[in-house]
Amino acid sequence: MGPGGWRKPPLAGRNPLPTADVVIEVGDRVVLVRRKYPPPGWAIPGGFVEVGETVETAAVREALEETGLRVTLTALLGVYSDPARDPRHYTISTVYVGRASGAPLGGDDAAEARLFGEDDLPSPLAFDHAKIMSDYFRYKRTGKRPL
């Protein structure tokens, strides 16, 4: 029991960590980064939200750090919260769509950054990013965002 009879929740100290990702459109292709650190694979640029930072600011910052691209956010794609989506931590990710121009360059914790189309996505995609990319391409075709 805490002060005043307050009961500490069983998962206190293990709350979800907020992350922000952005599907970066460059023309008719999207930017993915090859992760430098485990878990391996290709991923949507993104990362953890820092203290005092908005989720939108984190998405733009992470995109710049990992790809060298200055991104303008254009849409909210969705929020992804499956507790098993990241093997390292329980994360809740807010995923945006954004636009940029130029050639991506891997930086920070991205070993490489490249442009891909729907028919030539690399494998494996890390985390739940295959689902997110599927949701993104469906959104582009239909205008419907995932729930």
Language model feature labels by segment:
Residues 1-21:
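Acidic, metal-coordinating catalytic segment for phosphate/diphosphate chemistry
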Residues 16, 40, 88-92:
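Residue-level preference for beta-strand/loop junctions
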Residues 26-65:
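Conserved Nudix-box catalytic region and its N-terminal flanking loop in Nudix hydrolases
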Residues 69-78:
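A short coil-to-beta-strand element that immediately follows conserved catalytic motifs
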Residues 80-104, 135-136, 140:
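Active-site-adjacent beta-strand/loop module that shapes the phosphate/pyrophosphate-binding cleft
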Residues 97, 105-138:
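NUDIX/MutT-family hydrolases
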